[in-house]
Amino acid sequence: MPIEDRDNAYLITHALAKDTLSQLRDIETEQVAFRKGLVKLGRICGYEIIDGAMETEYAHVQTPLTETTGEQVSGLDNIVIVNVLRAATPFVEGLLKAFPRAKQGVISAGRDEAAGMNQDGMFPITIDYVKLPEITANDTVVVADPMLATGSTMCAVLDHVNDAAKSKPKNLFVLSAVSAPEGLLHVGSEFSSADLLTVAIDDYLDDEGYIVPGLGDAGDRAFRTV
C-alpha cells in the first residue's frame, strides 16, 4: 500500500506480517522466538514482493492425468539479496525461503555512536566488510535491514550497492520491519529509484536515534548480546 506523501514508500499490510511484528515488539518475546519471528517476517515479506512486483508467465504442466496450463513466477533466478549485518541475518534467512535461488551480498555497517547525530539527524557510518555479487539490469535487488531509523546506515549501504552495479537493476527494494519517518524521508529523497517497503512506520526517533515505540535493538535481541 503506498504511503501518503512518499512516492517510493510502501506499507506491507499482510495480516500475518502485522501479527508477527506485534510479537517481535513484545519485551517478553525471548531470543529464540524473536529470531524465529524475524525469519517468519522475512518470508512473508518475500512473498509480498513476489505478489506485488514480479511477473508471472504461463507454463505447460504434465499432471499424473493430463497436460494442463499453469503459471510460474519469472525472474526468480535474478534476485540479489543484500544482508546488512548483523541484525538482518535472520530476516534474510526468511527471504531465502521465498527466494531460494537468490544471489547474496553482505555488507557490515554500523553507526559511530560516540560521534552522535549531526545537525541533519544522520550518524557517521563505518563499513567494515563488503562482498556483493554482480548486479545487472535484469536483477531485482532486495536490501534487507529490520530497522530503518535515521537512514544513515542504509544510505551508506546503498552507495556501495550502486557502486557495485554494472547497470541500474530492474528493481531495487529497501526492506525493513519497522521504519521511522525520518529514515524514510532521508533514504527516499536520496535514492529516488529505490522502493522502500516496511511493515510499520513508527512515531519518532529519540535523542539517541532509536525508533519509538520500535522493538529494541533487533541484533541484540536476535543474538542475545544484551
Swiss-Prot record:
Checking Gene3D superfamilies in the record gives: 3.40.50.2020
**EC number per UniProt:** 2.4.2.9
Instruction: Name the pathway it acts in.
Output: Pyrimidine metabolism; UMP biosynthesis via salvage pathway; UMP from uracil: step 1/1
Which co-factors does it depend on? Mg(2+)
Molecular function per GO: GTP binding; magnesium ion binding; uracil phosphoribosyltransferase activity
The catalytic activity, as recorded, is: UMP + diphosphate = 5-phospho-alpha-D-ribose 1-diphosphate + uracil
SUPFAM superfamilies xref list:
PRTase-like
Quote the record's cofactor note: Binds 1 Mg(2+) ion per subunit. The magnesium is bound as Mg-PRPP.
Provide a GO biological process annotation: UMP salvage
- Fetch the NCBIfam families from UniProt: PRK00129.1 (NF001097), upp (TIGR01091)
Function in brief: Catalyzes the conversion of uracil and 5-phospho-alpha-D-ribose 1-diphosphate (PRPP) to UMP and diphosphate.
Q: Which family does it belong to?
A: Belongs to the UPRTase family.
Q: What is this protein called?
A: Uracil phosphoribosyltransferase
Origin organism of this chain?
Answer: Haloquadratum walsbyi (strain DSM 16790 / HBSQ001)
Q: Which gene encodes it?
A: upp
